[in-house]
Amino acid sequence: MNNKEMKARQEKIRNFSIIAHIDHGKSTLADRILEKTNTVSSREMQDQLLDSMDLERERGITIKLNAIELNYTAKDGEIYTFHLIDTPGHVDFTYEVSRSLAACEGAVLVVDAAQGIEAQTLANVYLALDNDLEILPVINKIDLPAADPERVRTEIEDVIGIDASEAVLASAKAGIGIEDILEQVVEYVPAPSGDIEAPLKALIFDSIYDSYRGVVLNIRVIDGVVRPGDKIQMMSNGKTFDVTEVGVFSPKPIARDYLMVGDVGYITASIKTVQDTRVGDTVTLADNPAAEALPGYRKMNPMVYCGLYPIDTSRYNDLREALEKLQLNDAALQFEPETSQALGFGFRCGFLGLLHMDVVQERLEREFNLELITTAPSVIYHVNKTDGTTVVVDNPAEFPEPVTIESVEEPYVKAQIMVPNDYVGAVMELSQRKRGEFITMDYLDDYRVNVVYEIPLSEIVFDFFDKLKSSTKGYASLDYEMAGYRTSRLVKMDILLNAEKVDALSFIVHRDFAFERGKAIVEKLKKLIPRQQFEVPVQAAIGQKIVARSDIKALRKNVLAKCYGGDVSRKRKLLEKQKEGKKRMKQIGSVEVPQEAFMAVLKMDDQDNAK
């Protein structure tokens, strides 16, 4: 194909994403679009087709972005090439959304006709506006009994400030309005603006590791053309590779002769090691490189840290390899080696939130057959010491001794909670209980309120989301962003088993809640840790001071069973002898701590948490 034909084809390319809050129908809409454009035969069609991970199907959520090429014959008779990128809706995966939006010119904004705009809808719209995308509003689920499309239309105009007069009314499930959406994409989403004759410039927006082909790069070509046989160069580290195959996903990979401006597809180039590529890097040709790299992505900083340890310590290196391969596919994951006296060798991992942590742990266990122990998550604290230095601590076990601490600062987040009027009281009560500070409250319309609080991240990390959902019957939605550090009265609480500290069970707590939290955890551990042959005291301590204690009673054999009658001193002698044995055992005995005990520090029951 010569340059002229390529330029004509470029005019017919449309790249767009589907963005929405969780459960507003993104993946179902993507399914209908695939059916409508005959990309997938009805025999191969299945619900949530683009959610290829088992985990995504089970949980009914999208975790990974997915890019796919479709051909659509518009009403004007022309054939257009669409690149559709399905994105996640959960706040933990905002990074995936920002990456997919950088590869598009337009975004289809799906809003539930009954629920209206939610917190994540807004967050994703702002990301789309940052990328200068054309936004096409779609009001979905109009066949629901509670649907009120006109209210949602005014909400879109008032809250987001975009014209919704031409918003498509659709029902992805029933297949209503799908053609109107595709026609709007043709009409309103601009064609890619790159230059076909310029040196190659392509953005890596995702990558996966294939054990046969090495690293497979998912790219969006911004300028130029790339073909098999070309020598490509990574602009961040200058490494070069020979392209072996280029192609697109439709939804299965299909090899092509070239990828040109505006195409969204994949490249394989025998890239063997995971470290050679980075999501957000720019690919160019080695013999005709681009003058400057694309802006790429801002690096995501983890919000939550936890320790991951293999139950079988000999699989430490397998865990390292698994994390490296997962990092290719999940750029927001960070990790570094660490050791624990209780758990041996493992990794300290950083995540964007609890759901992200959960998903990574499950993927490691499923895709790499690892058995893992996870320690309770914690956030990053800044500890100002008496000698004038400041230490950054992400692991409670590394918290300095209380006598050396001048003050401790913890991260706060600005939480936007969208909630129906009836539940405002419940949300405010929960936020106050979690040490939140009220900032402001806006009425979006007669039914919905946007409540803004500043809350310590450590409180959000534990169980805020679950509690928010249960106290508002699932109607509230949450979005949060960092709001800096503040000084708080925090202390480190150690858990002692049989008078020995278990470093993996330590956690940071606000001084006002230390006593209740310590007491609750000690009681919980007492139930979870199996009884031993000797009595085991479980203690919670701040520094040298014990604040709570509970004893796990010993299992004991009835040594008097064979002692029929006889003198009482004989019975006493047997009991004393047993007592001596237990004492000796206690000095050398070690206590096995089950995985549930580590998670107990995390998930305290409601009555434990009445704080």
Curated annotation (Swiss-Prot):
Listed GO biological process terms: positive regulation of translation
Keywords: Cell membrane, GTP-binding, Hydrolase, Membrane, Nucleotide-binding, Protein biosynthesis
Disulfide-linked positions: none
Compartment(s) where it occurs, according to its Swiss-Prot or TrEMBL record: Cell membrane
GO molecular function list: GTP binding; GTPase activity; ribosome binding; translation elongation factor activity
Domain of life: Bacteria
All residue ranges annotated as the tr-type G domain in the record: 11-193
Keyword match Oxidoreductase: no
Binding residues annotated for GTP, in chain numbering: 23-28, 140-143
Uppermost EC category: hydrolase
Recorded GO CC terms: plasma membrane
Enzyme Commission number(s) from the entry: 3.6.5.n1
UniProt membrane topology term: Peripheral membrane protein
Leader peptide range in chain numbering: none
Pfam families: EFG_C, GTP_EFTU, GTP_EFTU_D2, LepA_C
Reaction catalyzed: GTP + H2O = GDP + phosphate + H(+)
UniProt-listed InterPro entries: EF-4, EFG_III/V, EFG_V-like, EFTu-like_2, G_TR_CS, LepA_C_sf, LepA_CTD, LepA_IV
Main location: membrane
Cited CDD domains: EF4_II, EF4_III, LepA, lepA_C
Biological role stated in the UniProt entry: Required for accurate and efficient protein synthesis under certain stress conditions. May act as a fidelity factor of the translation reaction, by catalyzing a one-codon backward translocation of tRNAs on improperly translocated ribosomes. Back-translocation proceeds from a post-translocation (POST) complex to a pre-translocation (PRE) complex, thus giving elongation factor G a second chance to translocate the tRNAs correctly. Binds to ribosomes in a GTP-dependent manner.
Family: Belongs to the TRAFAC class translation factor GTPase superfamily. Classic translation factor GTPase family. LepA subfamily.
Protein name as catalogued: Elongation factor 4
Natural source organism: Enterococcus faecalis (strain ATCC 700802 / V583)
Gene name of the record: lepA
